[in-house]
């Protein structure tokens, strides 16, 4: 497929990587799995079995006038355990490589259809200056943008570090959530070619 850069020059890119029909169910599944994989899963509470003490019956069964009790660590007592105590859990979901690649292709193709993918010949800043980067992004009408480069550019990374709605990633490190989260994806032609090889 033929795409145009901001300067107007044509770029030939794979129909497979940048022109696939959108599959909402697939994208939803992959994005959900990606977010689930990011969960720490270390949440833990103490049940009545975990709380220290409570082995002895606090008072006799009958004759006190009180409700019967077998332990001072019952969940209905102050200082007792939690009824359904949370346990550490692995939240990760299995996603096949083919599904992941398919979802990435769907997202990139949808970015193209929605005019949210901005192709540039090259995207760099002379010095790590936020002001300079902001001016470039404003020229591209991309205030909230993910910048995808073909290689790690320290100047660009440092210039974008202080901008809350701008992120810089290498073409090999893009993920489905980042591509969806930003209003625009500013991508160099070299990065697009790199992605084409990965997903094509």
Curated annotation (Swiss-Prot):
Entry protein name: Large ribosomal subunit protein uL4
Domain of life, source organism: Bacteria
Family from the record: Belongs to the universal ribosomal protein uL4 family.
Subunit note: Part of the 50S ribosomal subunit.
Organism expressing this protein natively: Acinetobacter baumannii (strain AB0057)
A GO MF term: rRNA binding
NCBIfam families: rplD_bact
Pfam family, one: Ribosomal_L4
Keywords recorded for this protein, A-Z: Ribonucleoprotein, Ribosomal protein, RNA-binding, rRNA-binding
Region (Disordered): 42-65
SUPFAM superfamilies, A to Z: Ribosomal protein L4
GO biological process, one term: translation
This protein's GO CC annotations: ribonucleoprotein complex; ribosome
Functional summary from the UniProt entry: One of the primary rRNA binding proteins, this protein initially binds near the 5'-end of the 23S rRNA. It is important during the early stages of 50S assembly. It makes multiple contacts with different domains of the 23S rRNA in the assembled 50S subunit and ribosome. Forms part of the polypeptide exit tunnel.
UniProt-listed InterPro entries: Ribosomal_uL4 (IPR002136), Ribosomal_uL4-like (IPR013005), Ribosomal_uL4_dom_sf (IPR023574)
Cysteine pairings via disulfide bonds: none
